[in-house]
């Protein structure tokens, strides 16, 4: 079953209110009234179809729809009365009257409302009609009095009046045709009048179209609003025979007017208006490039805020255009927001990376500096010895190897001298010639001054006073040979005995001034 079904009354209502109808089809109207009670939603569907035709732009259609509405109210009973007294119907009536429809349509609708209020005044269920009339009167809408219901009476008695008028028109047409036939037989004139008289008659019987008419049958004539039509036969009050540039045929007489003087100017103005409208439509049909314009959005919001919601005026064309343009901006605004969001995410990630880099930099700056191991291996400066004074020999040995000062003879010492916790790997990076003893020239050892204040006993006293006091011959030790000092007694008074470790005894040399030396490690 489809979601949206067609209104079952729409086709019959359109047929009963066709713009080409010259009279009301009461048989069809009564058939519609009979069908209203056959379905549960018949009254609602019928009223909806009728009000759709009441809002038609052709006044003839709206008047026929109001006639059908009055017939349904009079013949369909309470089920239709409840629909007429509903809020939806009251809103439709307000829109028809306030939108300045055709005056005849408004007057007929007002008269029907007054008539229904008089009929329903005893039933409180139908009080909405009277309340609607009262509220519209307060708004300035005028309604006819209850005693002068001419239009409503005409709507009720429309059948008899229209039928009588139709009978009279037919009788007149028959009379005229009989008279013409008698004249043709009695007169001796030519069957066809001269061409000049035909042209004059045509010029004298021209009418102007008030509405557009589209031919449905083959014998009908099609014309547009404002066109001139030559009347060939107007014997029938409702359908005339005429001719224009499209051909010859029948057309409804209420679609034309015989007043040609005032319509000439209006026709030219209408043509100009049509041309202007066409130009505007062409301009509007060319779509302008749409882009995000904050000014247009602000202007649309300003217009919307300035509108009073209580007013029932239609929206201006400027507002409609701005709303259309703003709606077209929607997808572009969404794309722009997505792009901004993406850039924001990228910048946020970049900001995090920059902060991490700055944090790492600050951490490295605040850490204790790591000095190179070579900075601790710089040579230590020793003060030069006094001239003519023997210099004491300081043998030094590390746990990783023997260390001798520059120009010092190699001695084997049991005492260890630690240079600190420096890694030995850094010392092994020195040149290999620093680790060889034979690569250096043997120098005589430094001699001390023979003072008792020396704290380290591992040195050798070469004072001449020791030899004189001992009274023994000096023992000459070959240069470069190691000797065991423990087997000898130190004859110096007040000096402790030497420890038992080998010491190299050099040949006596003259005291010379000693330059400062630098201690270098040997591997």
Swiss-Prot record:
User: In which residues does the motif PxVxL motif occur?
Assistant: 54-67
- Could you tell me the keywords of this UniProt record? Cytoplasm, Endosome, Membrane, Phosphoprotein, Protein transport, SH3 domain, Transport
Could you say what the effect of mutating residue 176 to A is? Loss of interaction with UBQLN1
- Domain ITAM: residue ranges: 360-377
Domain called VHS: residue spans: 16-144
Q: Which residues form the UIM domain?
A: 165-184
Role played: Involved in intracellular signal transduction mediated by cytokines and growth factors. Upon IL-2 and GM-CSL stimulation, it plays a role in signaling leading to DNA synthesis and MYC induction. May also play a role in T-cell development. Involved in down-regulation of receptor tyrosine kinase via multivesicular body (MVBs) when complexed with HGS (ESCRT-0 complex). The ESCRT-0 complex binds ubiquitin and acts as a sorting machinery that recognizes ubiquitinated receptors and transfers them to further sequential lysosomal sorting/trafficking processes.
Notes on the domains? The VHS and UIM domains mediate the interaction with ubiquitinated proteins. The SH3 domain mediates the interaction with USP8.
What name is this protein filed under?
Signal transducing adapter molecule 2
Organism name: Mus musculus (Mouse)
GN (gene name): Stam2
